[in-house]
Structures are given as structure tokens and as C-alpha cells.
Amino acid sequence: MSRSDTARPFVKWAGGKRALAPTLFAHMPQTFGSYFEPFVGGGALFWHLCACTRVRLHDIYLSDINWPLLCAYAAVRDRVEELIVRVGQHIACHTPTYYRLARRKFAVCEHPLEVAALFLYLNRSCYNGLYRVNKAGQFNVPLGRAAPASPFLNTTAPTPRSTQPAAQVGHLAIRIDEENLRSCARALANTTLNCQHFSCIQPARGDFVYLDPPYLGTFSAYDKTGFDRAAHESLAAFCMHLDARGVLFMLSNSDCPEVRAWYRPFRVQQLNAPRCIARSAHARGKRCEVLITNYPCADTATP
């Protein structure tokens, strides 16, 4: 894959790992079979792997419990040109009133392609690119006022990568980065996509699983079910199950006593990670988190 064909994350996602992707890559096993990512979110590690020409991924399984997110991945993979047109239509109509109408339509829409188009439009026009739902599962993020830099909706390039005009409300301007969406479509061509609970994946001995759940004690409203302490305990038990079956796994989570206790049998390394979504750029800073593996990797420590 050439530099110009390198795909980048096409959604902004709370807890996204784009800045950490090189570090995560360095801690992956040298060899493995199939690749699984059951909390795909923005998919930063997957996109990083796609950009590494020395990595040859064979069977790739990306999944998440968030249905609109998986609709977006599937639409990019299977119907990217139609998706570009539909998102462009939403952008052309972009006003505060239209945003509120689109948000209401998104809550009841059942057509996968239109769900994907609305999802991507809302993801880039909402406040700080945050995806959040209430207990009824309805997207409830207000309209954004800042213009976020984005590989999907291009706000900063002097020469737009879009054949469609930008929409602007206040100082929020959004364009479709068609080039990146097409690169993403090519990268996703041979992937298996599923909307499912993390426990539904079926890796075999020697396969590799990267798990990036909503962190303990942090934002988890990606889905109406949330991700509470019991879900974290269930995930830790699932990782024990993976280990017993000879499946290689790497897991990211917040650095706290509970997480260290749940994963005591495994290797734990502390990382400093940038905060990608916060109320202001000043507040984004860094947070401590841990990287947990059930195999030896470079610079692993258990402080």
C-alpha cells in the first residue's frame, strides 16, 4: 500500500488510539493467525496495520456492539460511492435546524446505508466529534462550534479532497475527504464485519485479539447498555478463557487497582496516553493506562 493510498480512521471516537497505534503495534506478537478487534471503535490499530507494508493480514474480524458504527464500516467497504453522495447531501443542507432534524431521523432510521450517512455527518458536525447516546439509545450530542481537523471531513487542507462544497455554520466547516474514504474501502475489502458482543468472537489457537473496551471509571455511553463494572469483570473472565485456548491477546484499560487485580496473571505495562476528546484542548493532556498481554513483549513491566 503506497503512502498516498494509506487509509486513516474515518470517525472520531472517544478513547481512540491513533496517537498510541505505533506503541500498540510494537507490542503485538511477531506472528499470529487471524486478527480480531471486538471493540473496533475508530479502528486506529487496524488502520495502522494496513499502512505497514511489512504486515500481511489474512483473516480480519472487526466488530463492535454499536450498530450505527458497524453500518458505517459496512457502507465504506461495500457502497463507498453511494455513501459519499449521501453524506455530501447532508453536508449541503447543514444548518443548526437541519442538524437537529438529522439527529431525530438518526434515532428512528433502519436503512443501513442512510444510518451510515447520518452517523458520519453527525460524528463530524456534533460537539467535539463525540458519539454519545442516552438510555433509550438515542444520539444526544449537541451541534459543534469548533472546526475539528479530520481525515474524513477535511477542515484544514488548502486544496479540498472533495468534489462537493463545504458547509459552514459559524466557524464550523466540513467537507468529505473522499480520497481517504476510498482508501478505507480498499483496506476493508477483505474484512469480516459483525455487530456483536465481544464474547461472540471465535478465535482459534494462535490467533490475535486486540481489546479496547470503554475504560473502567470513564465515559462508556457508546451504546444504551453502557459498560459497567460487571461488564469489565466479564471481559476479564473472557480473557482468561482466551488464554486457556492458546489465543494471543492485548488489552488496553485504565491504570487502577481493580484492573491490575483482574489481570494479575498476565503482563502489565503502564502507558501515558493522550486524551483525544475533552471539553477544551487545554484539558486533553495525558492519562495513565495499562497495556495487558498474555505473551512476552518488549519493555513489559509490572510496576
Swiss-Prot record:
Keywords: DNA replication, Methyltransferase, S-adenosyl-L-methionine, Transferase
Binding residue positions for S-adenosyl-L-methionine: W13, K17, D64, D212
EC annotation from Swiss-Prot or TrEMBL: 2.1.1.72
Disulfide bonds: none
Record's keyword annotation contains Nucleotide-binding: no
A Pfam family per the record: MethyltransfD12
One annotated GO molecular function: site-specific DNA-methyltransferase (adenine-specific) activity
BP GO annotations: DNA replication; DNA restriction-modification system; methylation; mismatch repair
Keyword S-adenosyl-L-methionine on entry: yes
Alphabetized PROSITE patterns for the sequence: N6_MTASE
Reactions mediated catalytically: a 2'-deoxyadenosine in DNA + S-adenosyl-L-methionine = an N(6)-methyl-2'-deoxyadenosine in DNA + S-adenosyl-L-homocysteine + H(+)
Top-level EC class: transferase
Coiled-coil stretches: none
PANTHER family: DNA ADENINE METHYLASE
NCBIfam families the record matches: dam
Protein family membership: Belongs to the N(4)/N(6)-methyltransferase family.
Role summary: Directly involved in methyl-directed DNA mismatch repair, DNA replication, and gene expression.
Protein name: DNA adenine methylase
Native organism taxonomy: Bacteria, Pseudomonadati, Spirochaetota, Spirochaetia, Spirochaetales
